């Protein structure tokens, strides 16, 4: 499927949503009421997720899109939200919770099986409104096996970078900024910045951003090509790393899905020593999760979440789909690379911190992404004006909350 075709299907999906139409999917006859699910997984990952769902015997329809935020917003505004929404952006779920749209997940999963930071709270919001279904490790750099990098900052020519996506663009660059702030400033200041307590114009934030911009500015033409490249590599290929032309990829554990049947050729190293301005000491690992929230009130939807959250389903999904579970009761996966990912998820010596842009309110995140793209397009320009613009958006966001913001808590923590 071409990128243009995907974009067309996305637009069609929005029109169908606005008209109240459903998307056909397996899981029961047309006469049966189906649990409607919106999630971020498409292509092979969608098939693997459906394979797990099909084992529950609960009729469902699944809509997979990289633009979960836009589709969910359209469905909510049309008065027809899905029963279950699965989003990486926990900040958006906080906004829906503040509007009273989310139903409690109490008794549908065992909270003690999920350590920090997998169960973040929000000030002024009741607990048990979201739960993590899938986890990914960030703060890592992929390389081809047998070609381990020297543990020092690498030039731009070594890096595999692409900003393009079917949904919001810019997040591959925001991951660089987040990782730099985390490794330079540590988890405490990182959490303050991610939740809006440390300003974007703080000198330490500017210095981290400058380190990334400085690397890009050494070869602005290459940076411009990276701005236009798709982060997954060419359609039908094996990702950016295994497609040739670069040696290192700053990408999460989900990157192996891009490498396809050649994923066994890739290994990873902690990113801290390779980041611009380093080498740094590993101070924490950035992680991400896809969180499920319940918009519907039906018993079937509640039962489906309960089944998805169970140890058996999480273990089966990991086995069939190669994904990682945030559930501490799920045994570590086998395989050298899988073991290294699992070890970092459970190493109590090194804190884990949720992806900062996922924690931020949607408007702030959008401004963050825009500033990333502008930096790639014009890397030699000063970064302070761009960060001032983000800070202004953040101030306006807080003002729109009538003095009652709901910042997330527990963004960083040591695993159990």
Where are these regions (language model features)?
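Extracytoplasmic/periplasmic solute-binding protein
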Residues: 131-133, 153-201
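Short helices/loops that flank or line small-molecule/ion binding pockets
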Residues: 69-81, 99, 153-155, 231-249, ...
